[in-house]
A protein has these predicted regions:
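Short hydrophobic beta-strand element within catalytic cores of glycosyltransferases
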Residues: 291, 300-303, 313
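Glycosyltransferase donor-sugar binding loop
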Residues: 33-38, 171, 204, 231-245
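Conserved donor-binding/catalytic core segment of Leloir-type glycosyltransferases
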Residues: 195-211, 217-220, 233
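Donor nucleotide-sugar binding/catalytic pocket of nucleotide-sugar-dependent glycosyltransferases
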Residues: 49, 128, 132-184, 195, ...
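Short His-centered aromatic/hydrophobic patch
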Residues: 83-89, 106
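Nucleotide-activated donor-binding/catalytic signature segment of Leloir-type glycosyltransferases, i.e.
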Residues: 245-264
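Conserved acidic donor-binding segment of nucleotide-sugar-dependent glycosyltransferases
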Residues: 314-316, 320-327, 336-342
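Acidic donor-binding loop of glycosyltransferase active sites
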Residues: 272-286, 299
Length: 406
């Protein structure tokens, strides 16, 4: 019998295609449901079903999404439903209501639990209530970092479902290496972007306040006082980010020393021109994929001390961790790596080893496949958490090495 997994996500669900392909190679039938374009899935031979919800609110749209997902599940009858991202994690359990085993992956807690803004604080009680409700129909909850698992336990958001720790959604190491091998030379990319011989600090993220872009811009000004020939390259969408987007006028104020390229599909190639990768997020991340990409590219990393970032970056081992919303600390860490290129290169090499060992897609896919099979074999919505899950307190991070090179 071929087991069928339906994976439900949001607008950037195409990022899960390598994960779905890895499940398919392990004998699963896979389908996907998301709010983005169907073409990437059809090109990969994956059945795709589009549904609608509003990432920025809209209760009416959410109710419609629950109805659409319920109809979809009844129509295709998967054996397991897997969800990623905040709203799908809430909406899909309400749509399925225990009819089929459902696994939700908490890939970060996001802005609501990272910001002290009144709007974020106001959302928190509703978020907690919805998570408790969703837990009633959840078979297992996967966390990408220990901090989020601890949070769900503290606020009793798991119900009777077991908690499982699986670091990240995985990164296809072979595909990443192939993309870099087939990319234009770094010299060509530098010419195309007009960078010359300048040092490059790169950021790949949505260009939002919550991702720390204003902090990065302030840090860029500080860095340039010490090293005038440094360029900051921002890669990622802005226009699609609604009320959270950074004002374009703010970015323009720092031109030409700050360049915003928009969303790009050639991130593996672009990372080849970076001397330092900066990730100033104020967000509660799961395991940020961009940190895995930067690590696999061998670029030394400066990230904020937020959940998820410390699972990839170990202070003075493969990069630096700094407080969020602190441009001076961010600038100092960037300058340290630029001023000590040999040490920075060694840090990058440690990141390569860490990502290949801990976050390879094959490692992650094996763990999910094992979880799905055990859920289905029980014939129940969930089983004894002690029998099903690996303890959420299992910490497979590089910090087990005591801050030494992995």
């Amino acid at each position: 019998m071929t087991l069928h997994v339906l994976c439900v996500g949001g607008e950037d669900h195409a990022l899960r295609i390598p994960f779905l392909a890895a499940l398919r190679s392990r004998g699963f039938r896979v389908s996907a449901a998301g709010t983005g374009a169907a073409l990437p899935f059809s090109n990969s031979g994956i059945d795709y079903h589009r549904y609608d919800f509003n990432r920025f609110g809209a209760r009416v749209a959410d109710r419609l999404a629950v109805g659409q997902l319920s109809q979809l599940v009844r129509g295709i009858r998967p054996d397991v439903v897997q969800t990623f991202d905040t709203k799908p994690n809430l909406l899909a359990p309400l749509a399925v209501r225990g009819a089929i085993p459902i696994v939700r992956t908490i890939n970060g807690m996001g802005w609501v639990f990272s910001s002290a803004q009144l709007k974020a604080l106001a959302f928190r009680p509703a978020y907690l209530a919805l998570q408790r409700l969703a837990a009633c129909w959840t078979s297992a909850t996967v966390f990408q970092n220990k901090e989020d698992g601890d949070f769900f336990r503290r606020y009793r958001l798991l119900g009777n479902s077991p908690a499982v720790l699986i670091g990240s959604s995985g990164i296809d190491v072979d595909a990443f290496d192939t993309a870099r091998a087939q990319a234009p030379s770094t010299a060509q990319l530098r010419r195309e972007l007009g960078l010359g011989d300048d040092e490059v600090v790169m950021t790949v993220s949505r260009l939002t306040v919550q991702k720390g872009i204003p902090t990065l811009l302030d840090a860029a000004a500080i860095v340039r006082e010490a090293r005038p020939r440094v360029r900051f390259v921002l890669v990622g969408p802005r226009e699609s980010e609604g009320p959270f987007a950074v004002d374009q006028a703010l970015i323009d104020r720092y031109a030409p020393h700050v360049i915003a390229l928009g969303a790009r599909s050639d991130v593996p190639a672009l990372l080849g021109i970076a001397n330092v990768f900066a990730f100033p997020t104020e967000y509660r991340e799961g395991i940020p994929r961009v940190l895995l990409e930067a690590g696999l590219a061998g670029v030394p990393i400066v990230a904020t001390r937020m959940p998820g970032c410390g699972d990839v970056v170990v202070e003075n081992c493969n990069g630096h961790l700094v407080p969020p919303r602190d441009p001076r600390a961010l600038a100092a860490a960037i300058l340290d790596l630029l001023q000590h290129p040999a040490r920075a290169k060694n840090m990058g090499q440690r990141s390569i080893a860490l990502v290949r060992r801990e976050f390879d897609l094959n490692v992650v896919a094996d763990r999910y496949a094992d979880l799905y099979r055990r859920l289905i074999l029980t014939g129940r919505r969930s089983e004894d958490p002690a029998a099903l899950s690996r303890d959420i307190h299992e910490d497979r991070r590089v910090s087990q090495h005591g801050g030494k090179s992995p």
